[in-house]
C-alpha cells in the first residue's frame, strides 16, 4: 500500500511547530515519519546559514530547492513507497510563498516560476494543512521566542500569507485552511479530523 504525504504550512508564528509536537506525541501517529524543511542534512545546514545572513535571494532559493530534492530522494519517497505516513513541518509550498515574496523585485511572476522549476520531480502532498493567522499576531509570537530571523517581519509575512492563500484557493482539494488564532484544543480537533479523513480515504 502506498503511503501518504501530509505537510504543515503557514507563516512564521502560525503554530506549525506546536501542532507538529502534538501529532508526534499522539498514539495514532506512532508509526508516522516526522520530518521538516529545512532538513538537518549538510544542505539544510547551509539553508539555515543563508537564513541568518544576507545571502542573495536567488542563491537562497537554490539552496532551499537543493535541500528539498535531497529530502525527497533520501527520506520522503522511500517512506511513502514503504506505505508510511509522512508528516513534514514545511515543504515546497513554503518556497512558493516565501521566495515568491523575496524574489518579486527580480522577476515578474516569481511564485509561478518557482513552481515551474519544481514541476516533474517534487512529490505533491496528499494533504496540506495551512495554518492561517494575522501576520501582526504571528510576529508577536515570534518575538516571544527570542531573536527573530529576517523572515519574521510583518510586511514580508503579509505577502507570504497572501501567497499561501492563493495557493490554497488554486488547490482546494489539497489544502485545508485552519485558523490558528483561537483555542489550541479546537485547532487540534480540526487537524486530527483533516488528517484522519485523508488517511482513511
From Swiss-Prot:
EC number(s) stated in the UniProt entry for this protein: 2.7.4.9
Species for this entry: Methanococcoides burtonii (strain DSM 6242 / NBRC 107633 / OCM 468 / ACE-M)
Reactions catalysed, as given in the entry: dTMP + ATP = dTDP + ADP
Keywords: ATP-binding, Kinase, Nucleotide biosynthesis, Nucleotide-binding, Transferase
Pfam families per UniProt: Thymidylate_kin
InterPro entries linked: P-loop_NTPase, Thymidylate_kin-like_dom, Thymidylate_kinase
GO terms classed as biological process: dTDP biosynthetic process; dTTP biosynthetic process; dUDP biosynthetic process
UniProt name for this protein: Probable thymidylate kinase
Alphabetized SUPFAM superfamilies for the sequence: P-loop containing nucleoside triphosphate hydrolases (SSF52540)
The UniProt record lists the keyword Repeat: no
Lineage start: Archaea, Methanobacteriati, Methanobacteriota, Stenosarchaea group, Methanomicrobia
Gene name of the encoded protein: tmk
Amino acid at each position: 500500500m502506498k503511503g501518504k504525504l501530509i505537510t504543515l504550512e503557514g507563516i512564521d508564528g502560525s503554530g506549525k511547530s506546536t501542532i507538529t509536537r502534538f501529532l508526534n506525541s499522539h498514539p495514532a501517529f506512532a508509526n508516522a515519519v516526522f520530518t521538516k524543511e529545512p532538513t538537518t542534512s549538510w544542505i539544510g545546514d547551509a539553508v539555515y546559514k543563508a537564513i541568518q545572513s544576507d545571502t542573495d535571494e536567488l542563491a537562497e532559493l537554490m539552496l532551499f530547492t537543493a535541500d528539498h530534492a535531497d529530502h525527497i530522494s533520501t527520506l520522503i519517497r522511500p517512506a511513502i513507497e514503504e506505505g508510511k505516513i509522512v508528516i513534514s513541518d514545511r515543504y515546497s509550498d513554503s518556497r512558493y510563498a516565501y521566495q515568491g515574496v523575496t524574489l518579486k523585485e527580480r522577476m515578474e511572476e516569481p511564485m509561478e516560476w518557482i513552481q515551474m522549476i519544481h514541476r516533474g520531480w517534487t512529490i505533491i502532498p496528499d494533504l496540506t494543512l495551512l495554518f492561517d493567522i494575522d501576520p501582526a499576531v504571528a510576529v508577536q509570537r515570534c518575538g516571544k521566542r527570542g531573536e527573530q530571523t529576517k523572515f519574521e517581519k510583518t510586511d514580508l509575512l503579509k505577502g507570504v500569507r497572501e501567497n499561501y492563500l492563493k495557493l490554497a484557493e488554486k488547490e482546494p482539494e489539497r489544502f485545508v485552511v485552519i485558523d490558528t488564532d483561537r483555542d489550541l484544543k479546537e485547532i487540534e480537533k480540526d487537524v486530527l479530523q483533516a488528517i484522519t479523513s485523508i488517511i482513511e480515504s
